[in-house]
Amino acid sequence: MSRRYFGTDGIRGRANGLITPELAMKVGQAAGLVFQRGEYRHRVVIGKDTRLSGYMIETALVAGFTSVGMDVLLLGPMPTPAVAMLTKSMRADLGVMISASHNLFEDNGIKLFGPLGFKLSDDVEKQIEQLLDESLDKKLAESASLGRARRIDGVHDRYIEFAKRTLPRDLSLDGLRVVIDCAHGAAYKVVPEALWELGADVIAIGVEPDGFNINKECGSTAPEALSRKVREMRADIGIALDGDADRVILVDERGHVVDGDQLLAVIAQSWKEDGRLSKPGIVATVMSNLGLERFLQSNGIEMVRTPVGDRYVLEQMLKQGYNVGGEPSGHIILSDYATTGDGFVAALQVLAVVQKLGRPVSEVCHLFEPLPQVLKNVRYRAGKPLEDDEVKSAIHAAEKRLNGHGRLLVRSSGTEPVIRVMGEGDDREMVEEVVDTICSALGEAAAAAA
């Protein structure tokens, strides 16, 4: 069965476009029916980021879950990894995060977690999708068996304590001036407080959500404001999270960006030296730079590649027994601590290395020279541009030209109508030429189908 609703990271789309109150209520009903197992009161945990549409979707989900007899625990704005953690901690049958991650406020989404805090498998998502296309009126709970909903206090403190426990008790961030950019998103309360409790001198930006400004010219996808603030305040480091805080990008004291590949290098090398790698390797995706792979190999660390998407990274980590994985975008999964990407916990591991070595972030966090990499996006409205003959011909010619000199990756986004074209190699000029040629062909195909 084809997947009509679920992408690589839950269900995502324009609020009141794809993501309507009707769909959200139906998701609540369908997911609630799938996760009702055993003769006991069933419960679901729901968190959200700071988008205006979160109120609408939250209310619709509550209606859906309670109508099939599930109790609902409402967390309010919380990072995605916190929702995953609390789903397991609070013994819930299911966890829900209302977020479109790094997208702007117009979009929203619904991410689902199983009782152990892991994202749902493809098979479970298919079960839910099947129910979404059915009438569920005859499967609703009897009047006396309807669920209840209530808001839970103190959840921020639970996540703060969890994050702090990922560092040694004797490690303090005292003496570090840290600028944190929360992207006006889900982490705006918890992360600045946690850094302060760990002893850092905290300067917080992106902590004034108004429902519209999430990820707008801030956060991990737009670190320029953070870079300026770090230089202005003469800070030691900048931390940029995205709207739901499952991604992180750092900025060194000079204002230079440290992406997910460099973070993986820092954590992998440090954990290998400390004997904390479960096996001598990590998991990355096809988007990770060849420079990272060469660096890791020179340090006796294997790198296993997966398709794009943190769910596939985690899948391989669990299957092969690795405890570190991630993506250049800043999804870093440390399975010793979390069941999904946790931007703040990943940042803390790097801060621990900085404190341990007593060296500037610019020295600690730039461990390899990335190969020139060009990444461009082509947006389309209709059709399937990748199936166009001219596009196929352009891709074939580019692969032939790069053979032995670099890598080429052309793929559809799993979360939005975009084709991503990535080229990588020792010769930047040649890489730019082949990427531009493919993008031009894609643009023409997209225009013809519109």
From Swiss-Prot:
GO molecular function, a single term: magnesium ion binding
Cellular component, GO, one term: cytosol
E.C. number: 5.4.2.10
PTM text: Activated by phosphorylation.
Residue numbers bearing the Phosphoserine modification: 101
InterPro entries, per the entry: A-D-PHexomutase_a/b/a-I (IPR005844), A-D-PHexomutase_a/b/a-I/II/III (IPR016055), A-D-PHexomutase_a/b/a-II (IPR005845), A-D-PHexomutase_a/b/a-III (IPR005846), A-D-PHexomutase_C (IPR005843), A-D-PHexomutase_C_sf (IPR036900), Alpha-D-phosphohexomutase_SF (IPR005841), GlmM_bact (IPR006352)
Listed cofactors: Mg(2+)
Record-level GO BP terms: carbohydrate metabolic process; peptidoglycan biosynthetic process; UDP-N-acetylglucosamine biosynthetic process
Co-factor: note: Binds 1 Mg(2+) ion per subunit.
Entry binding sites for Mg(2+): 101, 242, 244, 246
Reaction equations catalysed: alpha-D-glucosamine 1-phosphate = D-glucosamine 6-phosphate
Keyword Nucleotide-binding: no
Active site: 101 (phosphoserine intermediate)
Taxonomy, superkingdom: Bacteria
Keywords (A to Z) from UniProt: Isomerase, Magnesium, Metal-binding, Phosphoprotein
NCBIfam families xref list: glmM, PRK10887.1
Function: Catalyzes the conversion of glucosamine-6-phosphate to glucosamine-1-phosphate.
Similarity comment: family membership: Belongs to the phosphohexose mutase family.
Name assigned to this protein: Phosphoglucosamine mutase
Organism field: Rhodopseudomonas palustris (strain BisB18)
